[in-house]
Regions:
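Intrinsically disordered cytosolic tails
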Residues: 3, 239, 255, 280-397
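Juxtamembrane inter-helical linkers in multi-pass membrane proteins
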Residues: 57-66, 123-141, 208-231, 300-325, ...
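Charged, low-complexity, helix-prone segments enriched in Lys/Glu/Asp/Gln
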Residues: 48, 52-53, 118, 199-207, ...
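Transmembrane-helix bundle segments that line or gate the permeation/cavity pathway
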Residues: 1-26, 30-167, 195-208
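Charged/polar, solvent-exposed surface patches and flexible loops
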Residues: 29, 54, 79, 122, ...
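Interfacial aromatic "cap" segments that immediately flank transmembrane helices
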Residues: 16-36, 68-85, 133-159, 213-247, ...
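Membrane-helix interface segments in multi-pass membrane proteins
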Residues: 88-109, 157-196, 245-295, 350, ...
Length: 397
């Protein structure tokens, strides 16, 4: 009976995500993986990937319950061996001058790239469980290939550039003809590069939106809100950060070389060689650093954008408060320490960056967590395994 009182709206509970792993603990997993991969000439790679995924999944706490990585090792090994065979076949064809075979294999690789991506996402999500409920990727192959159209546009751009270059360049060209052809060749390459960058932006947006929109947990679909313009803004801002980093490095190089340049004429023999080697190492070191802040900036901005604009149907959503500046500084510190320790700081770097991203996300659930978990478990039982196995062959782990 309605007594005129408003109905109580279901409450929304917040559950911060948490990563409970540690750098020292993961270092033991990492060093064993590295040693066994070296000893087995790389064939331990699928086992190493599974151990790494199990560690990070198992220490990622969502509402006080860890994720589970349940991928079958056999599938990961078969996929890895198949990729090794394909790579060796391509390398043999390239080194023996089989240009037609190489071209056909490259075209086949471009054609199968969406299939590999779709198989990888299906494999990864199907291997992830939370409270016994499995995630699923339900996109059809036509949907995957339609989302991959930027990949084919980029391939056509480079094919057109190759045709244009072939028409302008020949082995019998005179120096004057080569000079005249340089302009059109640069224009063709520049146009292909520009098209590729735009296509990469669109491809990233298409794949992320398809992954979230076609993901299922217990039958509940994912919810995706970002638009392509959001990705364009992040890419443009990333270019600005990269240019700023280049300018800063250039100023440092001028200052260092200007100070040491006066020493070179007065030094002879071994001392001059050592100074030259030191400058070269510093140059390579700075080149490696120059892209680090830009890549970290883009990664952090995308992390915030995605996790602030996705959810699970209308029953759960996420919020992210990742500090972009803090993440960039963490990446720079990790790069420096990894270089100074000859790579041995790498596992600590991975853990610290993963923890910062995970700990920045909060899950908001409508109606209570136990009610949601029970609903997801019941709906999953009705779906069965048909959707999960629709790919037929999961190649990439």
């Amino acid at each position: 009976m309605d007594n005129g009182m408003p109905r109580a709206r279901p409450g929304i509970d917040a559950y911060p995500l948490e990563f409970s792993g540690g750098g020292g603990e993961f270092f033991r997993v990492w060093i064993v993986n590295v040693l066994l991969t070296v000893v087995t000439f790389g064939f331990y790679t699928p086992f190493a990937r599974r151990r790494t995924a199990q560690y990070f999944w198992g220490h990622t706490m969502v509402a006080d319950s860890p994720l589970e990585f349940t991928a079958q090792q056999k599938k990961m090994v078969v996929g890895f061996l198949l990729l090794v065979v394909l790579y060796l076949a391509f390398k043999v064809a390239a080194e023996t001058g089989q240009d037609t075979t190489v071209s056909l294999m490259m075209l086949a690789g471009a054609g199968f790239a969406p299939y590999f991506w779709g198989s990888a996402m299906r494999f990864r999500l199907n291997a992830t469980r939370w409270r016994g409920v499995r995630l699923q990727f339900t996109a059809t192959w036509p949907e995957v290939y339609f989302a991959s159209w930027p990949l084919f546009i980029a391939a056509l751009a480079w094919a057109g550039a190759a045709v244009a270059i072939d028409a302008r360049v020949s082995p019998s060209m005179t120096p004057a003809q080569a000079k005249a052809a340089a302009g059109p060749v640069l224009i063709a390459v520049g146009f292909a590069l520009l098209v590729t960058v735009v296509c990469l932006m669109r491809l990233e947006f298409n794949y992320k939106s398809l992954l979230v929109g076609k993901a299922r947990i217990g039958g509940q679909p994912g919810r995706w809100k970002p638009v392509f313009g959001d990705f364009v803004k992040i890419w443009l801002a990333t270019v600005g950060v990269f240019v700023g980093s280049v300018v800063l490095v250039a100023v440092l190089l001028v200052a260092v070389t200007g100070g040491l340049g006066s020493l070179l004429p007065r030094k002879a023999g071994l001392a001059a060689i050592l100074i030259g080697i030191a400058l070269f190492i510093a140059f390579v070191f700075l080149l490696f650093l120059v892209s680090g802040p830009a890549r970290a900036y883009r990664e952090a901005r995308l992390h915030r954008l995605v996790w602030n604009n996705i959810g699970v149907s209308h029953v759960a959503r996420f919020k992210c408060d990742l500090r972009v500046g803090g993440y960039v500084m963490l990446r720079v510190k990790n790069i420096l320490l990894t270089l100074l320790t000859l790579g041995f700081y790498r596992p600590f770097a991975l853990v610290s960056e993963y923890r910062m991203k995970v700990d920045s996300v909060t899950l908001h659930v409508k109606g209570g967590l136990d009610q949601l978990a029970g609903q997801l478990a019941r709906e999953e039982q009705g779906l069965g395994d048909a959707i999960a196995d629709a790919a037929g062959l999961d190649l990439v782990g």
